[in-house]
């Protein structure tokens, strides 16, 4: 949550959160920098990135929210990138009304999409394979590269468990309107969620049944000799 005014000159600003990024106060950024001695390793310009833990889709997973009374963010001669969850993929949020952009500053906003297909049965390992995207966003597909890798953060059974992955990208006619949710600290990985179902119990083998001993036929009495 950003509640105090922020001013950046000849530098970059990145605000990210596992859930919502909330803007309550003024942001003023003038000229980003690609100079590695001053960029802090941040993307060029202003970046607002929600739902970095990959719990979407949907705003419940996290989105970028400008408070109704927040002043317009002012960006001069630098790019602005917003990564957010929309209410619906059919209704992207228009963040352009929240900014004053001058001297070539440009806004790019990306709807977050989430890899699917990672559910599996418990097998004691974390590895899984991702296929498709949750919520069927139009015009975009998940593409697995030759070194694609996906792993749960733990091997125990459970629902809504975090999966981190690398080597997957987006393709399709509208791919440039979307982005995968990446973390903002540490080694770069994307995230989604999945379920590890408990292993099915092994089938039980009934104990062998011993047949009862056969009953011998009745023995007739010996014939009697009349006196």
What residue ranges belong to the model's regions?
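The right-handed parallel beta-helix/beta-solenoid scaffold, focusing on the short coil/turn
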Residues: 4, 11-13, 19-21, 25-27, ...
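Short solvent-exposed loop/turn micro-motifs enriched in small/polar/acidic residues
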Residues: 7-8, 187
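Detector for methionine-enriched segments
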Residues: 14-15, 111
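Short loop/turn motifs that initiate or flank beta-strands
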Residues: 38-43, 50-227
């Amino acid at each position: 949550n950003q509640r105090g005014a922020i001013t950046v000159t000849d530098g970059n600003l990145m605000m990210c959160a596992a859930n919502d990024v909330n803007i309550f106060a003024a942001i003023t950024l003038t000229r980003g920098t690609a100079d590695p001695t001053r960029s802090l390793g941040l993307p060029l310009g202003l970046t607002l990135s929600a739902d970095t833990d990959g719990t979407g889709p949907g705003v419940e997973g996290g989105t970028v929210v400008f408070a109704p009374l927040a002043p317009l963010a002012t960006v001069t001669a630098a790019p602005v990138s917003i990564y957010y969850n929309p209410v619906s993929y059919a209704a992207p949020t228009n963040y352009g009304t929240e900014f004053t952009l001058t001297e070539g500053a440009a806004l790019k906003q990306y709807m977050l999409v989430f890899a699917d297909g990672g559910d599996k049965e418990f097998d004691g390992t974390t590895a899984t394979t991702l296929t498709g995207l949750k919520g069927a966003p139009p015009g975009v597909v998940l593409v697995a590269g030759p070194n694609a890798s996906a792993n749960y953060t733990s091997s125990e059974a459970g629902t809504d468990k975090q999966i981190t992955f690398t080597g997957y990208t987006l393709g399709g006619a509208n791919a440039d309107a979307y982005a995968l949710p990446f973390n903002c600290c540490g080694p770069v990985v994307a995230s989604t969620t999945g379920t590890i179902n408990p292993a099915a119990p092994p089938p039980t083998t009934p104990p062998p049944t011993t047949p009862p001993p056969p009953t011998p036929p009745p023995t007739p009495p010996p014939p009697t000799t009349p006196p």
